[in-house]
Amino acid sequence: MYAVIYDNKVLVGPMNWNRGMFQGALERKGIQYPLPRTAPNNLPLTINEHAKIMRVDEIRPQMNPLVEFYYGPLWDITEEAAIANYEVHDSPIESMRYNLKQVAAQARYNKEVLGTTATIQDQEVTIDTNRGARDIFVQKYLLMADSDLVNWKFPETWLTLTKQDLSLAVQAGAQYIQNCFDWELNISEQIDQAETKEQLLAITIVE
């Protein structure tokens, strides 16, 4: 990372080497100086008594992006480099809540599509709960007559299902998915009730 420095103040940067941006910054100060296409090995590059291009060293403390953000950079210009210091500040409480609700929604979706089990014809079978698979269960159930039979392949075995058998799979999947959404609602209510960063971070979302 690099920065254009003018009278010990940063004009442009920190950024990757960008000859066009750097020359533009110099020209706005009335300085014409042909810069190389790629970053020079020897830095700082002194342009004149006012301007130079320096390597940037960033100092970023550990930060939790769900509830905090970086403030800065606050510059410290040394002989060798421009030091970009960042401070960690708390995000507004509404931003914290929004971010944690996004985490909860993703966690709910991950649970939602994991699948569940049901006992059909005295056998425990896995019910696929991803959104495509559960639509197939429901559509087939709606199309079946009461007397129809259907051969169904579960991960564990093949079963010949009656409409009543298939309803057990549909009900198991629907109840499992509802439980996932109820879990997310509970987490969302806890988030809304929290008033501080510490209270928000005490909520267990992902185990």
Which residues are covered by each model-predicted region?
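A preference for well-ordered globular domain cores
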Residues: 1, 5-207
